[in-house]
């Protein structure tokens, strides 16, 4: 804005003042004229329009906040300030802010504070004519309120100073403070600075402000010609903006009551990240509020083996860093209402790196905005040149906007001898551009983030190792004996004592961990022993244990068996039952140390989630922690809001499909360490695994990086290492040739689906081609082949003779039958008398390649005296298997997802005690978790899962602690079908776990071997 425009605004304002009616009473009649009153009026002038139309409820709220009511226009005294017309200046500032990308919290509408009713603040120096005025009539509040106002004033002054420093970086703080003290508003200070210093301080800002001023001149010319009606609309808009600001400030004050340790500016930033949604901001703050009580081992000190007391209250600077690292990270799931396109911005990356400790890779990318070219420092030039020269195609695809084809083109252009040659070659090829070169910086920064995480984790691991070594060397020992609270008739295995000591060690250092022992090694017992240890140390809870529904009875039983001293509350049941439990908890009618609940009950409703957000839990233990492998899922986000000081995951399969799942688990247990780097972790570890012979050097490095990162936080032991006396487990692949009829049906289905794919036909079968092929490979009756449409029409007519269907429509009955499988129709024929003759023959029911093989296998096992646990993915397959077992007169029990939770434990007990029961039928999903079936020694997988770890879970129902016989695992695979491909893929997935857990030649041991070995040494094991 130039001086001419400013003078014109003053002239217009003076004209309005001269035209104003003289009969209006002046404020001086009610109180002495002073610069104080002038400043106060000037401070509140902007919000006048909004207060005129405020409803009664809003007026009441303002009274409670002790805000100053504004006098009407006709009572205002004419101000003599040279910056009267704030509207025009505000337009100028808004335009400049848009151009400069200035944060909204720097604008006056956010930074200005409302002052209480009786407080008068001096914001401008009095003139010589007014210095003689006394101030005896000025009333003040009590000292505490006055201190609060002074604190608010200081915050306001600091915010204004920070804003002016951004706009005028070449000016000293003292000059800018004088401007702030001489004016009452942010707009006035900026306008005064523009008059005194010129447009703004140098560089790109100067050019942008100049262009903004030119645009503002045009807008000023237009504003002179505006009719009064338009100016009235502007006034309404200004009033609306002021009203929005007041609402935002009320939200900030409301949030500050919940978190008094946070500054208002920090709370504003949190609210802006959540689009001023109070409830979402409150939940985010609550998630990380307890993290202030938990410090990373890198931040703690260890002296002579004694625990240094945790610092419960962070300093303000630490809190600010924490807020920016955590709260600013938005959830990566459906909670985001708007998901903006992630476009790499070099300038923003540099600015972000100044405060984000999780992504500040020491950025040396320097943008020169005085010209159109982007200039990059030589350090990054060399890194980018080397990256494009040596990276594989898989690595190049990590570059934003770089597809597989573009990566292939880049490799064909090699070698790149220098920077200029790189630009020349890239610009000549269609589809390639200079943007790919600049975007390489993103990948390099992400790698730097991973390297920093590795270094941080290595420091933690070294401290833990040093601590155990020191304790062992001093002879003090780290041998946490079995807690006395545990049942004295039961004893922990030696390796379980090592697990207990490891849990105690990471707890002492303020870390959270993942107990990832192989299935069947007693993770449940180790967790219960750890809770007993905490109880003896004075930490009596409350603790939370979240488990799958199928294992809740087993957990309750084990806790009562191993540690009856712990008071356990089971949070499970219908909505009404859980409502009563919540009522008892809130009113402290329940006496408990541990709450046991299921994943579904913990997060199924808002009331359930609210309960665990409000409860201040010490430890939250999550059984089958691999259910948290997807950090983008709603379940993951809901469980993250559980208000627990510490977290412990129990999982037998920490690595399943890719390394990202493992990183998701780490982010869950240590959010204050990993949450600031989730985007980098997601990109670096999300690629699929490959066989060892196809892995590039980079992919092997990724596995090494992941091993280094997880080392301090995870304890993983396999049965072969710790259970020397555990009977071995043998795996056997049984290739089953399909029956002649089944092979014909499979070939016909395969050709039909293949033809549909080639013709790009969109039909219902194409929705799940793989599932259709799997079902046919298992049993033909899982499709409808034998019940032709003609048969179904006859059956639908006969159904009208049934008393239950005498008035039914045969066409509708026919439609219902069309979507049923052969076996479902067979069961239907058995239920109704008039269609009983349409039942399938037993030969058709048993006509399956797997059934032929299974019949022979079961006969042999029964003769040997073995007992069998038989798993299937499909409940309908279990129905057909029941027919097979009845036909061969084998006694059996069945458990699947439809079995009531209360009945499951009784079925398990019955099978383990009644040795005459030969087979236990189980669905893989319902019966593969947390069930002890050591009375059986043979596991048959009728059909394998796409996830091999689900099958491993099923196998370990028998191969676990307590097993006395050799365990045989038989997998039935239909020969020449899709199941052979599934088996090959599953073997590749299992290879990833081997890569993560086996000992490399260059390493001293597996992931936690150094710590675990030292613990065993200190315990004399």
Swiss-Prot record:
Catalytic function, reaction form: ATP + H2O = ADP + phosphate + H(+)
Gene Ontology biological-process entries: chromosome separation; DNA double-strand break processing; regulation of DNA recombination
- Kindly list the positions annotated as binding ATP: 516-524, 892-899
Q: Where is this cross-link: Glycyl lysine isopeptide (Lys-Gly) (interchain with G-Cter in SUMO2)?
A: 77, 330, 466, 719, 991
Q: Which InterPro entries match?
A: CUE, Helicase_ATP-bd, Helicase_C-like, P-loop_NTPase, SNF2-like_sf, SNF2/RAD54-like_C, SNF2_N
In the record, the note on similarity to other proteins reads: Belongs to the SNF2/RAD54 helicase family.
Pfam family of this protein, just one? Answer: Helicase_C
SMART domains per the UniProt record, alphabetical: DEXDc (SM00487), HELICc (SM00490)
List residues, modification Phosphothreonine: 54
What EC numbers are recorded for this enzyme? 3.6.4.12
Compositionally biased spans, kind Low complexity: 22-39
Q: Where in the cell is it found?
A: Nucleus; Chromosome
Q: Source organism's superkingdom?
A: Eukaryota
Supply the source organism for this entry: Mus musculus (Mouse)
The name this protein goes by in its record:
SWI/SNF-related matrix-associated actin-dependent regulator of chromatin subfamily A containing DEAD/H box 1
Keywords, comma-separated and alphabetical: Acetylation, ATP-binding, Chromatin regulator, Chromosome, DNA damage, DNA repair, DNA-binding, Helicase, Hydrolase, Isopeptide bond, Nucleotide-binding, Nucleus, Phosphoprotein, Repeat, Ubl conjugation
| Major enzyme class | hydrolase
* Bias type Basic and acidic residues, positions: 7-19
What is this protein's function per UniProt? DNA helicase that possesses intrinsic ATP-dependent nucleosome-remodeling activity and is both required for DNA repair and heterochromatin organization. Promotes DNA end resection of double-strand breaks (DSBs) following DNA damage: probably acts by weakening histone DNA interactions in nucleosomes flanking DSBs. Required for the restoration of heterochromatin organization after replication. Acts at replication sites to facilitate the maintenance of heterochromatin by directing H3 and H4 histones deacetylation, H3 'Lys-9' trimethylation (H3K9me3) and restoration of silencing.
**GO molecular function per UniProt:** ATP binding; ATP hydrolysis activity; ATP-dependent chromatin remodeler activity; DNA binding; helicase activity; ubiquitin binding
Annotated Helicase ATP-binding domain ranges read 504-672
Q: How does it assemble?
A: Binds to DNA preferentially in the vicinity of transcriptional start sites. Interacts with MSH2 and TRIM28. Part of a complex composed of TRIM28, HDAC1, HDAC2 and EHMT2. Interacts with PCNA.
Q: In chain numbering, where does the motif DEAD box fall?
A: 1000-1003
Question: Where is the CUE domain positioned along the sequence?
Answer: 156-198, 247-290
Q: Give start and end of each Helicase C-terminal domain.
A: 853-1005
């Amino acid at each position: 804005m130039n001086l001419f425009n400013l003078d014109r605004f003053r002239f217009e304002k003076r004209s309005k003042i001269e035209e104003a009616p003289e009969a209006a009473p002046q404020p001086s009649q009610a109180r002495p004229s002073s610069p104080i009153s002038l400043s106060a009026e000037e401070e509140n002038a902007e919000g006048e329009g909004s207060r005129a139309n405020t409803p009664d409820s809003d007026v009441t709220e303002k009274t409670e906040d002790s805000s100053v009511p504004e006098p009407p226009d006709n009572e205002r005294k004419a101000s003599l300030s040279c910056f009267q017309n704030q509207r025009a200046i505000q337009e100028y500032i808004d335009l400049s802010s848009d151009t400069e990308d200035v944060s909204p919290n720097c604008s006056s509408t956010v930074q200005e504070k409302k002052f209480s009713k009786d407080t008068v603040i001096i914001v401008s120096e009095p003139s010589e004519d007014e210095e003689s005025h006394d101030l005896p009539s000025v009333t003040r509040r009590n000292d505490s309120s006055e201190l609060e106002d002074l604190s608010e004033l200081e915050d306001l002054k600091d915010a204004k100073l920070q804003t002016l420093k951004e706009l005028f970086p070449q000016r000293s703080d003292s000059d800018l403070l004088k401007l702030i003290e001489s004016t009452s508003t942010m707009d006035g200070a900026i306008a005064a600075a523009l008059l005194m210093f010129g447009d703004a301080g140098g560089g790109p800002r100067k050019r942008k402000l100049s262009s903004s001023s030119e645009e503002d001149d045009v807008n000023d010319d237009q504003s002179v010609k505006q009719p009064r009606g338009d100016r009235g609309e502007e006034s309404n808009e200004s009033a609306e903006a002021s009203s929005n600001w007041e609402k935002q400030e009320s939200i900030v004050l409301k949030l500050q009551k919940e978190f008094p340790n946070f500054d208002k500016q920090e709370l504003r930033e949190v609210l802006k990240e959540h689009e001023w949604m109070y409830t979402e901001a409150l939940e985010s703050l609550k998630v990380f509020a307890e993290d202030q009580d938990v410090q990373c081992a890198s931040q703690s000190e260890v002296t002579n083996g004694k625990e240094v007391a945790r610092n419960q209250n962070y300093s303000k600077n630490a809190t600010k860093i924490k807020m920016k690292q955590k709260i600013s990270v938005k959830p990566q799931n459906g909670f985001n209402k708007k998901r903006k396109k992630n476009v790499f911005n070099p300038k923003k990356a540099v600015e972000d790196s100044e405060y984000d400790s999780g992504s500040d890779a020491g950025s040396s990318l320097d943008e020169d905005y005085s010209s159109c070219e982007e200039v990059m420092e030589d350090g990054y030039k060399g890194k980018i040149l080397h990256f494009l020269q040596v990276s594989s195609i898989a690595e190049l695809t990590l570059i934003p906007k770089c597809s597989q084809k573009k990566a292939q083109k880049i490799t064909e252009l090699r070698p790149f001898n220098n920077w200029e040659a790189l630009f020349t070659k890239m610009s000549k090829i269609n589809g390639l551009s200079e943007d790919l070169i600049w975007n390489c910086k993103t990948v390099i920064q992400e790698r730097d983030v991973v390297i920093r995480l590795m270094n941080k984790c290595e420091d933690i691991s070294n401290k833990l190792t040093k601590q155990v070594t020191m304790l062992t060397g001093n002879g003090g020992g780290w041998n946490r004996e079995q807690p006395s609270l545990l049942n004295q008739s039961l004893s922990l295995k030696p390796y379980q004592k090592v697990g207990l000591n490891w849990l105690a060690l990471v707890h002492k250092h303020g870390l959270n961990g993942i107990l990832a022992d192989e299935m069947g090694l007693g993770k449940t017992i180790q967790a219960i022993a750890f809770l007993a240890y905490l109880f003896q140390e004075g930490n009596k809870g409350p603790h939370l244990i979240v488990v799958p529904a199928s294992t809740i009875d087993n957990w309750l039983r084990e806790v009562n068996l191993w540690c009856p001293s712990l008071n356990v509350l089971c949070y499970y049941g219908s909505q009404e039952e859980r409502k009563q439990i919540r009522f008892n908890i809130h009113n402290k009618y329940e006496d408990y140390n541990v709450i046991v609940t299921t994943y579904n009950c913990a997060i199924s409703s808002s009331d359930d989630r609210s309960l665990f957000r409000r409860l201040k839990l010490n430890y939250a233990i999550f059984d089958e922690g691999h259910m948290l492998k997807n950090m983008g899922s709603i379940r993951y986000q809901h469980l993250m809001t559980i208000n627990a000081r510490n977290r412990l995951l129990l999982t037998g399969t920490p690595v399943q499909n890719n390394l990202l799942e493992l990183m998701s688990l780490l982010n869950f247990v240590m959010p204050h360490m990993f949450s600031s780097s989730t985007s980098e972790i997601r990109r670096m570890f999300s690629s699929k695994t490959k066989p060892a012979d196809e892995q590039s050097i980079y992919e092997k490095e990724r596995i090494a990086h992941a091993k280094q990162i997880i080392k301090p936080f995870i304890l993983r032991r396999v049965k072969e290492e710790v259970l020397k006396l555990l009977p071995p487990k043998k795996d056997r692949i049984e290739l089953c040739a399909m029956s002649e009829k089944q092979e014909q049906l499979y070939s016909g289905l395969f050709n039909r689906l293949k033809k549909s794919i080639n013709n790009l036909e969109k039909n219902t079968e194409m929705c799940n081609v793989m599932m259709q092929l799997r079902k046919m490979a298992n049993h033909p009756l899982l499709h409808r082949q034998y019940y032709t449409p003609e048969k179904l029409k006859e059956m639908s007519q006969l159904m009208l003779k049934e008393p239950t269907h005498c008035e039914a429509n045969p066409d509708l009955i026919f439609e219902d039958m069309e979507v049923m499988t052969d076996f479902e129709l067979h069961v239907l024929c058995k239920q109704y008398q008039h269609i009983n003759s349409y039942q399938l023959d037993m030969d058709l029911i048993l006509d399956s390649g797997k059934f032929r093989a299974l019949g022979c296998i079961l006969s042999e096992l029964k003769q040997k005296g073995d007992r069998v646990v038989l798993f299937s993915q499909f409940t309908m397959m279990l129905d057909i298997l029941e027919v097979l077992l009845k036909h061969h007169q084998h006694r059996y029990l069945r458990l699947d997802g439809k079995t009531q939770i209360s009945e499951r434990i009784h079925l398990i007990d019955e099978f383990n005690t009644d040795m005459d029961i030969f087979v236990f039928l189980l669905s893989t999903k319902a019966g593969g978790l947390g069930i002890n079936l050591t009375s059986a020694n043979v596991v048959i997988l009728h059909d394998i899962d796409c996830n091999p770890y689900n099958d491993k879970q099923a196998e370990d129902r028998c191969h676990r602690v307590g097993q006395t016989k050799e365990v045989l695992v038989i997998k039935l695979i239909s020969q020449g079908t899709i199941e052979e491909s599934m088996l090959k893929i599953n073997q590749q997935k299992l290879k990833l776990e081997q890569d993560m857990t086996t000992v490399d030649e260059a390493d001293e041991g597996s992931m936690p071997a150094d710590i675990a070995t030292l613990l065993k040494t200190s315990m004399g094991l």
